[in-house]
Each structure stands twice: as C-alpha cells, then as structure tokens.
C-alpha cells in the first residue's frame, strides 16, 4: 500500500514538475515572440526614418556643428580644411548602406543598446582563429554557441611582413592583409555577423603608420607635404629635447623615441618601433585623412572602433607627450563625427595608464568621448589577487570603478593579446609593507611557476635587467594551473585548476561593465611554445598566448568529462545566468561587501527589484565569508541551492551567485 502511495506521490510530483516546465517554456516563448514583434516594429520604424535621409543628416549635423567647429578651429584655425571635413562627412553618410543606416536609427532610439546583460565579447586573431575572414564567417555558429554577440577582430589591415608589430604597423588603412582576405570579404563577414546580431570590433591605429605607408614613402623621398605629416628633424637638437621628457615605450627592444634615416638624412619620431612613424596631428591634413579612414571602415560594417594607443597621439615639446589636452579634443571631435555620420558606431579607447589617467577618456556626461574603455588596472589587480590571495587591493579598485557614473562602461577581461604590465596601486600596497620592485619580482616569479605554491606557467616580456622590471605573458588556463596539471597528468589538480579558472570568469561577469573572453579561454587552451620556432616571432614572448585555435580540442567541448567540456559547460552556465538576470545590466547598482576574510571577495548587484550577491574565494583553502545580509532568503543561481547570505561557507576557489528570493 505504501509503495502504491509513494508511486502516486512521485507521479504527482513529476506531473507538477512537467506542468511547471511547460508553463515556464510557454512564458519564455511568449516573451521571445513579444521581443521579436517589438524588434520588427522598431526595424519598420527605422526603415521609414531611413527614407528621410537628408533631414536626418542635417539634424545630426546641426546638433554638433557649433562645438565641432569651435574645437577644430581652436586646434587648427583652418576654415578651408574644416569645410573639406564637413563635405566629406556628408559624402560618407550618403555612401553608407541602407541596412547600416537602419541600424544607426535603431541604436539612436536606444542609446543604451550595448549596456544590456546579453552583451558578451570575444577577441581573436583572424588567422589563428579560422585562417582568414571567410573562415571566421564559417565559424559564426561556434561563436554563437559561446554566447558571444561581439567579436573583436585583432589587427587585419595591410602590414609589411616581418615588421608588422602584430598588425599595428599599418601600411594601408583601406586594404586587408592578403592572407586574411579582402575588403569585400570584410563586408561579407560583417553582414553575416549582423544577420546573427553579432557586433564587429576592429583596431584603428591612430598614433602611427608603417614606414611602408604611402605617406611615409613620399616623406622618405623628401616630399615636404608628406614630411609634415610626421615628425622629421635634420639634426639631433630638437629630438634630444624630446628625449629629456618623453618616456620610452620599449626601453630594451626599441630604445629611444627617434630613428635616424640615412637615406633621408633626417630623424623621424618613432615612439614604438623604428618602423612605426608617429603621425603629426598638428597638421589638419593628418586629422582629416584619418577621419576619412575611420568613416570608410565604419561603412564596411564595423560596429566598434578600438582606438589604439590613444594617449600618445598629440606631441608637445617639454611634456611627456602622453594624455595631453589636445588628445581629448581629438577624441571628442571623433565622437561627434561618428554621431553625425554613423551613430551606431561605438568608440573603444585603449588607455594603458594609471587609473586616474584612464577615466578622463570617457569625457563628461555632457561632452562624452569614448563609449567604452578597457579596465586594464582591474585586470592586473585581479592577477595580483590570485598571487597574494588577498582581495583588499582589488576591493578598493572595484569601489573606485563602482563609484563612477553609470554612463561609463568598462570592458572587463582576464587575458588579451597583450602582456600583463604590473601597473598596480603601489602607494596603497606600500602601506601594507609591499615595495614596488620586489613585489613585481614576486608576481613575475609566481606566474612563471617559481614560487613554491604556484601552479602557473608563462614567460616574461621586455625584461629589463637593470631595473628588474618585466611584463608577463600566458593564457588564463596556464596561469590557473591547467597546463601544469595536464603535463603532470594529475586529475585532482586539473579539477582545482578548472574551478579556479571558472571562479575568475564568474567574478569577471559580476563586475560593472561588459565581459570579454580571449579566444581559447572558453576551452581552457594553454600556452603555445611553438612561437620559438618562428624567427619572426621568437624574440616576442607575447606569442606564447597568441597560439592558433585548436579545433580538435574545441570538438571535445560537448563531452562533459573532458577539460574542454568542463570549462565550456561551466562558462555557458555563467553566461546563461548573466543573460537571464536583469541585475547584470551594465547600469545596475554595483558595490563590494566586506567579508572579513582576506581571501574572499563579495560583490553586490541591484536593478529593478532584483538583487544578486557574488561570493568568490581566491584561496586554495575553504573559507567563510562573514557577510550578514538580513533581508531574507537567497538561492544560489549556480547550484539551485537555497542559502542564507550570512556566514557563507565557500570551498577553495569556489563561487556563488546568490539571488534574493
């Protein structure tokens, strides 16, 4: 009898569960249908507006004209060049495709479109990821499976072989590297991406060109018009004065800021490498032509323009030639030009500077500059936290970011194509007894695997034997211990490494802003040491984390017993939670909570009645987060377990997303 009753009870429970699932599915489908209908209506309205092109352009132009002219004349004082700029802006507007204009109108109507909780980025080198642009197009389904709707195509414009600086020495701003494809392939790719609602980002190198650029070739031959587009000097007098105040970017691999050209009989300014010549933005012709290049690329379907090395673009004798006021004038003008011609475009600033020098590149709420900036300092501080198991500096850094206006959007990432520079808040660390030089050495030793308790692997970049300074290179997985565990065939260590990797991603998703994955991180891809076999790469250890995408490993992502499957499934779960919970929008209230445990970080998010608390253990030991949220019960969105948000016990490298019930 009892067995029958139990069977009836189980059956009733199953029917109840099935009914709840059916109702949830029906609700989700209804919401999806309503969203599709709203999007269709918005698109129809946008297409209608597209028919009013001329009046739309005039409205945008008139809105910005006074400020744009004021700033241009303040910088250049040249009416004819300003008139030429305005004429070409209108030309590029009329050349812009109907589909891109429709997208512009839709984004104008919803200016916070990129701040939603479904915005997820991925960056990759085209050749490493899929061979060429057609290959990337064939992999869009994979990108969708990664829950990514924004891809950053690392530099793909034409560069000279062997002197490309990873694509940042551009020889032609209107030509794609032959091995990667053509401009037509780029347009095909952006069109295919837009059909899948994937946004495309590219690098726009404003500070310099390759010495193989047509301008540079003419300048080298002695053409004064083109020499004036760079910084040429026929003796060492003025360059020597610059060297007194301008820091070196690469003091060991490319010392100094000038290069002697024997065939030209002149010095030329080269802040980065000798084959990258700094552009002279004092010349209005340089600004105008670079804006035309910007608009040309925007019209190819690019959604996000990453302005490379933006703090460097204005030079002034007697200064550091970094972060000068004129830089902000140029970025502000670029923002307005974009809002007039192609308002669907976003400007992403690459500002690798101290925190107080980064934020000004957002501009002000009234006069904005960049839409988004990289959260460089928080990234470096995150890895400091991994090495020290002490969240105090990271908590302070997050508090600063969380205190900024909600209009300011950071891109958050764990790793990227570049090295990690240890630009930390050393005055604060000094109060904890940490000295800058010795702490940098500790961090580099730790992540190379030299410290006794380290599981990380990687290499140094640009090490200076005199100062002891160096930067670090490695993939997220290798820095978390996946490489070491795999080499030693230690299954337990591998589980710990994957949990650590996932914890860091869960924490990154909880930050204010937009998360960006580095391609390969979704399958825990480790360091690639084969770069040492290539003479063009062997001297640059950054290529250790620029390895080709391993599609054989990626194919294992569907097997939950593999390293790739565990990582991919874990990330997918986090991404699905982020997309489904409105508290993850970029403009949500975000704050940190004191845990009274130096190895545990706690972040709160609140939006429109929803509250989520993230708890992250940066230690290899079980800990307790001594928080005390007394406003009710919580449920962990990851495990589904109901919990109290008070005295939370959390396992080694564990993570919780606690949502208030």
Where are these regions (language model features)?
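Active-site and adjacent substrate-binding regions of carbohydrate-active enzymes
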Residues: 2-5, 38, 42-661
């Amino acid at each position: 009898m009892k067995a029958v009753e139990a069977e009836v009870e189980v059956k009733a429970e199953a029917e109840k569960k099935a009914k709840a699932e059916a109702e949830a599915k029906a609700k989700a489908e209804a919401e999806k249908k309503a969203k599709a209908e709203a999007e269709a209506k918005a698109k129809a309205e946008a297409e209608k507006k597209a028919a009013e092109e001329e009046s739309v352009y005039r409205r945008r132009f008139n809105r910005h004209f006074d400020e744009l002219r004021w700033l241009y004349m303040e910088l250049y004082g040249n009416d004819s060049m300003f008139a030429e700029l305005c004429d070409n802006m209108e030309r590029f507007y009329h050349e812009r495709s109907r589909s891109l204009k429709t997208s512009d109108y839709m984004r104008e109507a919803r200016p916070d479109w990129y701040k939603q909780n479904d915005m997820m980025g991925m960056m990759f080198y085209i050749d490493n990821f899929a061979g060429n642009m057609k290959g990337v197009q064939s992999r869009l389904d994979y990108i969708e499976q990664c829950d990514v709707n924004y891809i950053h195509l690392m530099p793909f414009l034409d560069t000279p072989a062997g002197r490309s600086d990873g694509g940042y020495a551009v020889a032609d701003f209107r030509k794609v590297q032959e091995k990667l494809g053509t401009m037509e392939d780029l347009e095909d790719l952006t069109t295919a991406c837009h059909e899948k609602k994937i946004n495309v980002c590219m690098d726009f190198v404003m500070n310099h060109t390759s010495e193989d650029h047509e301008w540079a070739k003419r300048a080298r031959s002695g053409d004064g018009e083109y020499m004036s587009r760079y910084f040429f000097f026929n003796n060492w007098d003025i360059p020597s004065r610059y060297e007194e105040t301008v820091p070196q970017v690469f003091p060991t691999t490319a010392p100094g800021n000038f290069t002697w050209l024997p065939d030209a009989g002149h010095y030329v300014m080269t802040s980065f490498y000798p084959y990258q010549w700094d552009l002279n933005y004092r010349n209005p012709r340089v600004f105008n032509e670079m804006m035309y290049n910007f608009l040309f690329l925007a019209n190819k379907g690019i959604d996000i323009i990453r302005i490379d090395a933006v703090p460097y673009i204005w030079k002034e004798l007697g200064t550091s030639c970094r972060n000068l006021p004129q830089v902000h004038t140029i970025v502000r003008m670029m923002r307005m030009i974009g809002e007039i011609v192609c308002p669907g475009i976003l400007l992403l600033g690459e500002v690798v500077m101290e925190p107080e020098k980064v934020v000004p590149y957002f501009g002000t709420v009234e006069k904005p500059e960049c839409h988004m900036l990289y959260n460089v300092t928080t990234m470096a501080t995150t890895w400091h936290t991994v090495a020290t198991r002490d969240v105090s500096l990271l908590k302070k850094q997050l508090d600063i970011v969380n205190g900024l206006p909600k209009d300011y959007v950071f891109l958050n990432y764990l790793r990227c194509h570049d090295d990690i520079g240890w630009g930390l808040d050393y005055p604060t660390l000094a109060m904890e007894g940490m000295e800058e030089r010795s702490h940098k050495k500790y961090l580099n030793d730790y992540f190379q695997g030299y410290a006794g308790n380290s599981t990380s692997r990687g290499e140094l970049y640009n090490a200076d034997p005199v100062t002891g300074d160096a930067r670090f290179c490695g993939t997220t997985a290798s820095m978390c211990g996946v490489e070491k565990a795999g080499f030693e065939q230690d299954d337990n260590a591998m589980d710990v490494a994957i949990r650590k990797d996932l914890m860091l991603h869960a924490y990154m998703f909880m930050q204010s802003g937009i998360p960006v994955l580095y391609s390969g991180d979704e399958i825990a891809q480790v360091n690639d040491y084969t770069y040492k076999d290539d003479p063009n790469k062997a001297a640059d250890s950054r290529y250790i984390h620029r390895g080709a995408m391993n599609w054989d490993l990626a194919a294992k992502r569907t097997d939950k017993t593999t390293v790739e499957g565990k990582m991919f499934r874990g990330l997918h779960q986090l991404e699905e939670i982020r997309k489904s919970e409105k508290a993850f929008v970029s403009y949500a209230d975000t704050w940190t909570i004191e845990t009274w445990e130096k190895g545990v970080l706690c972040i709160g998010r609140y939006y429109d009645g929803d509250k989520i608390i993230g708890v992250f253990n940066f230690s290899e030991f079980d800990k307790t987060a001594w928080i005390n949220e007394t406003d009710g019960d919580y449920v962990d969105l990851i495990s589904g377990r109901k919990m109290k948000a008070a005295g939370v016990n959390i396992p080694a490298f564990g993570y919780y997303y606690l949502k208030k019930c």
